[in-house]
Amino acid sequence: MENQPEKESWVYVAVENPGGNESFVGLADEQSGIAYIPAFSTKDDAQACFINMPREAGKKYEIQAVIFEDLARDAAANGFLIFILDKDGKINNKIDPTEIQGSSQ
């Protein structure tokens, strides 16, 4: 498993409705009921994997860089885990953002 990103490091995520009422793209594993935000170590990995991710027709998406701690805060507030994926969609790390939030308080 890949190491967890540092709080201050950049990760890459898909954003829905960029520039407007934007939000991070979250997915759910229907079998386990786990909701997660896919994140990537590099923009290239994010773009390569995003091509194969489910999307809603008619919505705009964009890959954006975000500070890992900011992503963790939003994920925790909305009940999502963070999965660090590679370009093929393989899970490199599963992160519970509530553990990150707890360590920063």
Say what each PLM segment does.
Residues 1-105:
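Conserved NAD+-utilizing ADP-ribose enzyme module
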